[in-house]
């Protein structure tokens, strides 16, 4: 999901798998983007999706209760670039330490993390 579009030389376009990019040609950003995205996914018979969006996209999915699982990496390092993620006001179901970082798992609708 991108208002500006993505450069064609990004690695996601390396032909290893199907990639769907939604931009302002497919999505009206002045309307409910979650409904529009879900309608597009349903039309394309896509049953599972990973949303790696910016704060606005992620917050819209969380606030619409249209999510099953959230994974958040937390670090003590100061990250100077990037976009701040949404503020999750839930208790993590599981936390795993990976080197000097913490991976937090949140679930909705009874999803479990037994495979981790």
Where are the predicted features?
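Enzymes that bind and transform nitrogen-containing heteroaromatic metabolites
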Residues: 1-116
